[in-house]
Amino acid sequence: MAYRESFYRYLMTQRDADSSDEVAQFANNAQHDLTFPKQEQDYEELSDYLELNASYLPSMSVFDRAYKMYEEKMMY
């Protein structure tokens, strides 16, 4: 099986402190979340964590968009 980076590692490539993009803001905030599951790849596990712990995420649709971008990147 090919190596697949974690969602967190991918998300960190989307950080941009000067951006108003919701995914960039999600990444900026996730960087400071000390309990974020940094090795996780699974959508359901990440979704469960974020629903319960990520008050910095304005909407789960932001996560959905970021995860779709992650999946597309991991296909190559």
Curated annotation (Swiss-Prot):
It comes from Lactobacillus acidophilus (strain ATCC 700396 / NCK56 / N2 / NCFM). Coiled coil: none annotated. Belongs to the UPF0346 family. InterPro entries: UPF0346, YozE_SAM-like, YozE_SAM-like_sf. It holds the Pfam family YozE_SAM_like. This is UPF0346 protein LBA0976.
